[in-house]
Amino acid sequence: MISVCMATYNGEAFVQEQLLSILSQLSAEDEVLIADDGSTDATLEIIQSLKDPRIQIIPPSPRRLGPVYNLERVLSRAQGKWIFLADQDDVWLPGKVSKVLAEFEKTAADCILHDAFFYRKNQDGTWECGNRIFEIRPPHHGIFSNVKKNSYTGCCMAFRRNLLDKALPFPQSLPMHDQWIGLCAEKTKKARFLREPLIKYRIHLHNATDLANGKRASLGQKILWRWSLVRILLSRLGR
């Protein structure tokens, strides 16, 4: 069983296309878990209009949680053997699920990180695939290497349930869920990179991820967080 986990917020422009690209690759036994973080647009109505029994909308939180801890709510309810992360605004390319599952079987990996095409809007309003994420951010192994410079992009990740059990609950004040899950995978030494683009990673004004919107923390924030991250990882998973 596959659990696709998605956090949404004001994603009406793209969420239907993304969900259709996902659902077409799943079996009847799989699930798509969605937690909305208080959207003020038609995101929830669009999701509900699909009327697909595999989609489960998690009851809302009484307050906004932000993308990291909203996703944690979804992950904590996942029932599948394999967990796939999905952003609300991307597009899964045909064959993504089958190729990732084949890689799991071939490598005995706990976590697969695959490549993606950047998907940008042209001046004429059409969308076009550009460079690959791995060209901009070449992936690398190692805990301290990934604390220094993160390889992991959540929407390009899938992992086994045993890794999810290690990653939850998220540490407090976690700025990036993908880096945390990736570090948990690096600790097991069972992370693998699949160098084939399997999604269109959409770039637009309202991206929540740092890779797309160029947000930068201060040097002090980075140092404090990196030290905290290593300490938590070692205490959680052992030396």
Residue spans of the language-model regions?
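Short, well-formed alpha-helical segments that are part of the catalytic scaffolds
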Residues: G11-S24
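Glycine-rich, basic loop-to-helix element that forms the pyrophosphate-binding segment
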Residues: P60-A78
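Cell-envelope/extracellular polymer assembly enzymes that use nucleotide-activated donors
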Residues: M1-S3, E31, W180
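A conserved acidic beta->alpha catalytic loop
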Residues: S21, D36-E45
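Conserved donor NDP-sugar-binding/catalytic core segment of glycosyltransferases
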Residues: V97-W127
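Conserved nucleotide-sugar donor-binding catalytic segment
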Residues: P138-A212
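Short aromatic/hydrophobic "clamp" motif used to bind/position activated sugar donors
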Residues: I83
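Short beta-strand/loop segment that forms part of the nucleotide-sugar
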Residues: E29-G38, I58-P60
